[in-house]
Amino acid sequence: MRTRKIMMTTVLMMLLAAQAQENSIAIDKVGKRVEYNPMIFGQFIEHFDNQVYGGIFDPGNPLSDEDGFRTDVIEAMKEIKTPIVRWPGGCFVSTYHWLDGVGNERQAVYDKTWQTEDPNTFGTDEYVKWCRKVGCEPYICTNAGTGTPEEMSDWVEYCNLTVGKWGKLRAKNGHPEPYNVKYWSVGNENWGRHELGARTVAEWGPMVRESAKLMRSVTKDAKLFAAATSDPNWSLPLLKEAGWTLDYISIHGYWDPLYHVNNPASFIDCMMKTDAPERDIVRTIDILEQAGFGGGKIKIAYDEWNLRNWHHPWHGDLRRGFDYEARRKNDIASTYTMADALFSACFLNACLRHSDIVDIACFSPIANTRGAIRVDKDGLTRRTTFYTLFMYTNYLEKYYIPIKTSFTSLIHGDKQTTVLDAVLTCDKESKRYVYAVVNKDPEQVVDLKIDFASMGKRQPKELSAWVLAGRSADDYNDRGDEHVRPEQRKLKIKESVVAIPAHSITFIIVE
């Protein structure tokens, strides 16, 4: 009972403190302006369920082009200015052999990871062609599970050389010009027991080192990644052995763990998770610095991220087997509410705050499962997360500017977070500023005081803004009803204070 009283007193004190404070933002004059890499708005696609087959690739569908690519998906991806797409996995890649997916003599294979058949009709050539139509960079993740360093470097040869066995095979397959694929990753989540071909800490560093050496011998200016985590016990030995061969370390994050039971967290519970991605980023930056690769010598690629993990019961339990029908629960429209939209905005804000080191991020995945786009045979739906990505790729300016913030708390049980999350961007001349502000409160409008003088501006009578809010915190989009989308509004200002709508992402424009 005494413990409960202490906890209640602590919570009450935090609530009173929160009520006493004001929410304010101002430019940090000491901070350094950074031109962030738009690759942080990247995407990911895996041979899982209906992401590729029946998703982005559906030959014979009236909505597909002559190559079998869904044109509505391509157009939607152009709307969010997709800069890069990671493929083919994901866990799938750890039993994928790229040679099975090229040429005219392809055969379907049994995918041991997801325990189903893959027809191999969407392989390297189709992927690169699809990326060209989307207008994005291809980013290939190689098989470091059941594959070998030589197989990885052969794949680089197939994509990038005009000479040798594999470059000539690409030409024979109808593609005489090299693809010049720049981004390559050694492995996927090889630290995990769920991964087929998982490695020990002692095995992983040498595996990465030798793979990277072979791959770079083919393409000198390749950008090379390796599967890592924010755990120093894994990543420090990796960097000690192989850091000198790498440009990036790859980390992943899903914060609503729905592997076995599809019981999505509530809006407020999701908001309590919004600080977690930045903690992982900071831990990973600390690992890089400890290993002697700080200051951008090696950068971070958050190349799989989403609020909610994919629902695939019993994956990794080889005795129990895979529940195929359960995968359909990933596509329930009502799952993807304003919680997903706001969490995604907070994630992107964290990437921007550390954009000197976080250089690439890939939302996981682009289509179906937990994707920003839901695709069926008759059309598609842009989920709430799609419009988060749309706002960040269309309305932000190109330079991140550090800001000083003072935010009150949003408290739920024994957990708390700041009620607001914000970043500031500007154009090259520092004439046009855009604040990206997230209000995590499910019900309350939150007043925010803006220091206009720190931007060299006078307080205007009103501000232009783009707002993504929906009708409630649990609002979502479905086929034929995409009402959760950005709205242009005018925000009134009184004594430098502007009202931020509840459960919203608000982009405030200051000119």
Labelled PLM ranges:
Residues 1-8:
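Bacterial N-terminal signal peptides that target proteins for export
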Residues 12-20:
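Hydrophobic h-region of N-terminal signal peptides that target proteins for export
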Residues 20-234, 239-248, 277-278, 282-313, ...:
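Non-catalytic accessory regions flanking glycosidase/transglycosidase catalytic cores in CAZymes
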Residues 216, 263-270, 330-331:
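Short glycine/proline- and acidic residue-enriched helix-loop micro-motifs
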Residues 253-269, 315:
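Active-site His/acidic residue clusters
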Residues 202, 318-319:
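Glycine-rich, phosphate-binding/catalytic loops in enzymes
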Residues 319-326:
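Active-site gating loops and adjacent loop-to-helix segments of metal-dependent hydrolytic enzymes
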Residues 245-248, 267-272:
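Active-site cores of enzymes that catalyze phosphoryl transfer or operate on phosphate-rich substrates
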